[in-house]
Amino acid sequence: MTGILCVEEEGGILFHQRRVSRDRLLIDWIMKKIGEKSLWMREYSKTLFADYPVKIAEDYLAQAGSEDYCFIEDGSYTEYLDKITGLLLCRWRRHYPSDLKFQESILAEGWQLEAVYEVKGSSHENIMVEEWKKRKASHSCCERGEQ
């Protein structure tokens, strides 16, 4: 599954249980990027995607399949890091107050930056989107060679 998170320049996601920002053109870009794949989210995020078919569930991260995308606006993703194999990290490039932050330290633990996109926004001039993939674990340390 691929998680999609929108963060301000210090990693903030929410402030007093409200998103720190939003952008209509970024939503359009996300939907073009994922194509025909399913996009899961909780009820709170549904209004952002009113023009698109999305799947709604409070346990959306548990229900999403391996090829699905999840729009994440809470801290519950940390419980599903073993299931998440990709991230689209959308950076607002502005500072907004926040009290829930994305844990950037997880990216140093087996993740690789695959691509960076510049997205022209409606309320933000440019939004940087980083595409991260989880590196596959190498089992070479455990393999036995023939003698």
Regions found by a protein language model. Name each.
Residues 1-147:
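Enzymes that bind and transform nitrogen-containing heteroaromatic metabolites
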